[in-house]
Amino acid sequence: MASVTITSVHEPTNPLAVAHTGEREVEGDQLIKTDTNNDNDIINTLLNNFLYPQELKHNVFVPRFQQRITIVKAWDILSLSTSPPNGTNGANGTNSAPHRPKDLHILDIGCGQGESAVTMAALLQPHMHGARLHITGIDTARPDYGTPYTVAETHAHLTASALGRHISFRREDAAAFFSPSRLSSPSPPGSWPSAANVDAVTLCHSLWYFPTPQSVADLFTTLAGARVPRVYLAEYSFRGSLPGGQQDAHILAARAQALLHASVLEKLSADSSQQNHQGREPRPRAPNVRAALDVGSIVEAAAAAGWAVRRQGTFVPAADMIEGHLEARLVVKDAFAEAVRAEGLSPEREHEVLGLVPGVKKAFARLAAAGVAKGRAMDVWWAELER
């Protein structure tokens, strides 16, 4: 089970919020250590609704969905639907009549193949009690992107599944989704859900894939302009809390990939014939990690657009989450060095990127010497933002 640390000035209020196992006061905020409940039934539901290769079920998709369950529970999005209206609990402490949940429209930005969207549908819908739930996933990836199943194939499978009535997908970015024409147009009866009635935006392991720090800053500005009430984030933190450097390989490999991406963009920006490089599709050799802002940079970009952290926390991914290990293995392969050299970077930049590779190899060597076969994924940071 994943241990979750939450720093918050607001108590979770819904049945999906992770269960408390102990707490202490820290500088006026509340630090709550929590453990996930048994989520096997939810995972089975997700697997029954998702399109994936059976041979990757236990090694990839079970831990991937478990991580998203942990994130969605920590986010506590359901409180937006189930919290009673202001003033229903009087000063004398008496409770009002049971509050009927309100409709909930969530925009999942950078939804990929839909893992986070379907996880929210499976977790939230049983608690809506007659209110409507819809998750709109948006992504700019090509429909034929992905293997062995493409984005188009997984989206079609999801929308035709038992949870599909709560999910839809669009190929566009946040600026297009929240275009002035959509926001300014009157919402006729029956238009729910629409861009004008988004209750929350989620970014689940998607900010790292934005091309530049400026594109992340622009996103927060767009969300502020659209008057989105809440934004929920989850991203790797570039930090590891496990002893013995178990997460070092993932951290260093991610830095190497991010530096490669930044170096390529720097080179392209200097080439007048490539002025529109930021809008193009990723290169076939492009690393999975792109801008990869750290936590402080994400919070700073959000704050510049008027967003403040309402709640935040961290957790260590489960031991069977191998995606960090796979990212690190990619960097130590000869193919990564060959790809770096093929980019035609300046000698200084090439040396800087490749100079991070020995550190990843040393991290693996230390683990091997300790009898550890695989590196662990770095800590995940999540947050709830408000304006």
UniProtKB/Swiss-Prot annotation:
GO terms for biological process: methylation. Pathway: Mycotoxin biosynthesis. Residues 98-223 are annotated as: Methyltransferase domain. Disruption phenotype: Does not produce N-methylated compounds phomopsin A and N,N-dimethyl phomopsin A, but accumulates N-desmethyl phomopsin A. One of its GO terms (molecular function) is methyltransferase activity. Keywords: Methyltransferase, S-adenosyl-L-methionine, Transferase. Its EC number is 2.1.1.-. Belongs to the class I-like SAM-binding methyltransferase superfamily. Erg6/SMT family. Methyltransferase; part of the gene cluster that mediates the biosynthesis of the phomopsins, a group of hexapeptide mycotoxins which infects lupins and causes lupinosis disease in livestock. Within the pathway, phomM acts as an S-adenosylmethionine-dependent alpha-N-methyltransferase that catalyzes two successive N-methylation reactions, converting N-desmethyl-phomopsin A to phomopsin A and phomopsin A further to an N,N-dimethylated congener called phomopsin E. This is Methyltransferase phomM. The gene is phomM.
